[in-house]
A protein has these predicted regions:
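Exposed, low-structure sequence patches enriched in small/polar residues
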Residues: 1-157
Length: 157
């Protein structure tokens, strides 16, 4: 097991030569505490994150904050394959009555509730044939209940 604390600061200055309305500046910090637990057949990481960004879009100032939790895990099927799961839940707010935040703020997350679930399965059916599948779910201000599935069989020569 492992406990990790991370903190980073960022400054992003985007200048547009085409439209001045696209010029923006974002400064802030992101904090994350995570706990990792590795077993013989599985890996798990639980984390809590918190961030604050402030900046300017043309002449409008904003302050945004976000808090969330994340779980990432992987379960191994011996030498045959594994299944991975990533679950991310966050709540983000704009505190200065500005209607939106630039895409550089809060690590690209939208305002409001953000839910993202990603699963993937990799499995060797035989030594030379494998199956891969991923299932993804996203629900936020941009994508309302977006659900995708992708899979493939592979043959190795």
């Amino acid at each position: 097991s492992n406990l990790k604390l991370e903190r980073y600061h960022h400054i992003r200055d985007v200048e547009s030569n085409f439209l001045i309305e696209r010029s923006r500046k974002v400064k802030g910090s992101w904090n994350e505490i995570s706990f990792t637990l590795n077993e013989k057949r599985s890996e798990s990481e639980f984390s809590i994150k918190y961030g604050v960004d402030h900046g300017r879009v043309v002449s409008n100032s904003f302050i945004a904050q976000g808090i969330g939790i994340n779980y990432s895990g992987r379960l191994f099927f011996g030498e045959l394959g594994s299944v991975m799961l990533n679950f991310d839940l966050s709540e983000n707010k704009e505190l200065s009555n500005f209607q939106y935040i630039p895409p550089e703020a809060l690590n690209g997350q939208t305002l409001g509730k953000n839910i993202a679930v990603n699963t993937s399965l990799n499995y060797f059916i035989k030594k030379d044939i494998s199956f891969s599948m991923s299932v993804n779910y996203l629900d936020n201000l941009r994508y309302n209940n977006l659900f995708t599935i992708m899979g493939e069989f592979r043959a190795y020569l």
